[in-house]
Amino acid sequence: MNIQLRERREAASMAQTKTAMADCDIHPARATKKELYPFLAKRWHEHLETYQVHPYQGMMDGPPYPKAQPNASRRDAYPPEGGPQGSSLSFMQKQHLDPNNVVLGVLNPLKTGQGIRNHDLAAAMCSAINDWQIEKWTSKDSRLKGSVVVANEDGVTAAGEIRKRAGDPNFVQVLLLSRNVEPLGQRRYWPIYEAAQEAGLPIGVHAVGFGGNPITASGWPSYYIEEMVGHSQCQQTALASLVLEGVFERYPKLNMVMVEAGFGWAPSLGWRLDRNWERLRSEVPHVKRPPSEYIREHIWWTTQPMEDPERRDHLFDVIDWIGWGKLLFATDYPHWDYDEPSRVLPPGVSDANREALYLGNAKKLYGQS
């Protein structure tokens, strides 16, 4: 089954985007599994060859739902020199960065050390991925900035990796996933938030991840489409946990980005949280303000995948609640549900809001002049 059918010649012929933009969700890939070996101690080479990796969702590496396309990516994104989509800097520049006038691209590497049962291996792989981002990507193209990937189930070790990268201009955020062993507000993850706040780094919470639990609240669904729709449900769970466990009271300077789960659900979640907090606030005395206030103050949102209601004023109502200053443009390149920059926004967006969404908000959040 092929999801994205545009041929490479068609993509190359598309008109270039004149507006300078930040793409806050780009997925780089390794050309081969061994591409990470130069950044790993030799003991891990032997370990990976003999035992491979064992994620929480089972004893085999890989997602439980096939993605309909290899790596969930566009068919036209295969590099001409070979390798998986997203593994070639030169082709990424030619197909995406240059024609779309991307002046800031935030890398979110997936299929890394997150979610591995062996915590020592997970930490080693995450550190290697961070070195790999510098060596292969950010040092070769100054437009690209990395995300500090951490083995988040070991909060203390993850915090050490964040502090190791603090102040390194190659990195602009910490990367977590939305599905973990426990909801993200749990105390096992607090060392990560403490270190991120110390480093002045926002945390990107990317939809996906496998903590060994069913991916819905009622079990395992039948279809990939259900997993896709379920990304927003999982992000809601993560965000409610962060607010109600008091993370933003404890770490008042911490900012987070909800990545690749839409944002149309944000107002209704805020309303429901506020209503229940008014009635049950004695259970959570550490939550000192209405939950929606924490969401509006501490949370940014990537546009991709943007909701597409029949009436665009409905979309604008949602954004007005969130705030135009809290939206970050993202394409999800090279994945199949990529948002075309020249077509993503409906008519009626003011020039000021358009500039903020495409570039200004990202520069402010990530401290890029």
Q: What label would you give each PLM region?
A:
Residues 2-20, 30-99, 103-104, 131, ...:
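Mid-to-C-terminal alpha-helical segments outside catalytic/metal-binding sites
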Residues 22-24, 205, 259, 330-331:
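Active-site flanking residues adjacent to catalytic metal/cofactor-binding acidic residues
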Residues 28-32, 105-107, 113-119, 155-158, ...:
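Short catalytic/ligand-binding loop motif for oxyanion handling, primarily in non-cytosolic enzymes
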Residues 75-82, 97-119, 143-149, 172-176:
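Divalent metal-dependent hydrolysis catalytic cores, especially in the metallo-beta-lactamase
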Residues 83-91, 126-131, 182-191:
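Aromatic- and glycine-enriched glycan-recognition loops and surfaces
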Residues 84, 121-124, 153, 231-235:
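Short, surface-exposed alpha-helical recognition segments that flank or form part
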